[in-house]
């Protein structure tokens, strides 16, 4: 409780990595669907 900065940093890092993971899954889904329908 005395040092909230490292905990806040780790939470922001996890949120950023989660957003990158969702973006990567979205891009792969678009590429896969375009490959299937072509």
From Swiss-Prot:
Its main location: plastid. It is a single-pass membrane protein. Keywords: Chloroplast, Membrane, Photosynthesis, Photosystem II, Plastid, Reaction center, Thylakoid, Transmembrane, Transmembrane helix. GO terms for cellular component: chloroplast thylakoid membrane; photosystem II reaction center. SUPFAM superfamilies: Photosystem II reaction center protein L, PsbL (SSF161017). It comes from the Eukaryota. The chain crosses the membrane at residues 17-37. GO terms for biological process: photosynthesis. It is found in: Plastid, Chloroplast thylakoid membrane. HAMAP family: PSII_PsbL. NCBIfam families: PRK00753.1. One of the components of the core complex of photosystem II (PSII). PSII is a light-driven water:plastoquinone oxidoreductase that uses light energy to abstract electrons from H(2)O, generating O(2) and a proton gradient subsequently used for ATP formation. It consists of a core antenna complex that captures photons, and an electron transfer chain that converts photonic excitation into a charge separation. This subunit is found at the monomer-monomer interface and is required for correct PSII assembly and/or dimerization. PSII is composed of 1 copy each of membrane proteins PsbA, PsbB, PsbC, PsbD, PsbE, PsbF, PsbH, PsbI, PsbJ, PsbK, PsbL, PsbM, PsbT, PsbX, PsbY, PsbZ, Psb30/Ycf12, at least 3 peripheral proteins of the oxygen-evolving complex and a large number of cofactors. It forms dimeric complexes. Belongs to the PsbL family. This is Photosystem II reaction center protein L. The lineage of its organism: Eukaryota, Viridiplantae, Chlorophyta, core chlorophytes, Trebouxiophyceae. The gene is psbL.
């Amino acid at each position: 409780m005395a040092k909230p900065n490292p905990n806040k940093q780790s939470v922001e890092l996890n949120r950023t990595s989660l957003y990158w993971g969702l973006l990567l899954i979205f891009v792969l889904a678009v590429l896969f669907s375009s490959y299937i329908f072509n």
